[in-house]
Amino acid sequence: MDVLVVGGTGFIGQHLCRELDDQGHAVTALSRSPADATLPDGVETVAGDVTEYDSIESAFEGQDAVYFLVALSPLFKPDGGDGMHERIHLGGTENSVQAAEEHGVDRFVQLSALGADPDGDTHYIRAKGRAEQVVTQSSLDWTIFRPSVVFGEGGEFVSFTKRLKGMFAPGVPLYPLPGGGKRTKFQPIWVGDLVPMLVDSIESENHVGETYEIGGPEVLTLRDVTNQVYDAEGSSVSVVPLPMPLAKVGLSVLGSVGFPMGADQYRSLKFDNSPATNDIDMFGVSSSSLTTLSGYLRG
């Protein structure tokens, strides 16, 4: 199949392009900065900005399937402010769906997020929810994935965890966690486990019109994640529990003066980022076969 990966030079995108190429598909990766990626020689790259329809439209010509992977991180306030979530997630999806419909693309796969909701608590979740509506109301044969946090080579989940160490007291191994890190939950999935499911979704008609919530083999609190990250490298940190009301005020104030986290990041800390029902079985995958975060960290 001829496959276009919108956001193909990002973390998940590069892994997906490699897997698609390995499976014999003709792959094109579209991104704003295609030269920054390390992709197989067989993967074509094209430059385009999803917020500008005319810059991406021609890339959809002749494609059998399209993946939309472009996303801003919910872990930080985006450059340009929270309104960028609407511009990128919603606007980018609208432009991509329009181009796919214009060129008769057969399959459209949207990478969304757990909790996506047009009326959600954060700009990120609302934009993701509205983007899903654009996809489901289109004429395309679509599939939507809502993964929990994804980890692996090139990802930011583990590096973000490390960045918090000493953030408020450089050089001191203190780790401030709102609520002691016990309230925030994830079900992390390794990118190497997620990508084959993404590929399978365009190779079987069984996945058309389906929305899948995807998680890894275990539910972890933010404190669990923190401990695993530092245990794996043989170091330790002292967790400093921050009362949730204090974290709310602190992040709101810091966000207003340019700190890369703000009110939305506080709201995200209260969100259970694990799927209600893990749909990995729809791809013939069992939980016991998946890579744990600790297993990945220890190599």
Language-model features, listed with the residues they occupy:
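Rossmann-fold NAD(P)-dependent oxidoreductase module
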Residues: 15, 19, 80, 99, ...
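Residues forming the Rossmann-fold NAD(P)(H) cofactor-binding site
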Residues: 13-14, 90, 129
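Short, polar loop motifs at secondary-structure junctions
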Residues: 29-37
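NAD(P)H-binding glycine-rich loop region in Rossmannoid oxidoreductase-like domains
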Residues: 35, 43-95, 99-102, 114-117
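Oxidoreductase cofactor-interface core, primarily capturing Rossmann-like NAD(P)-dependent enzymes
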Residues: 118-231
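A hydrophobic C-terminal alpha-helical subdomain
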Residues: 245-299
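N-terminal Rossmann NAD(P)H-binding glycine-rich loop of SDR-like oxidoreductase domains
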Residues: 3-23
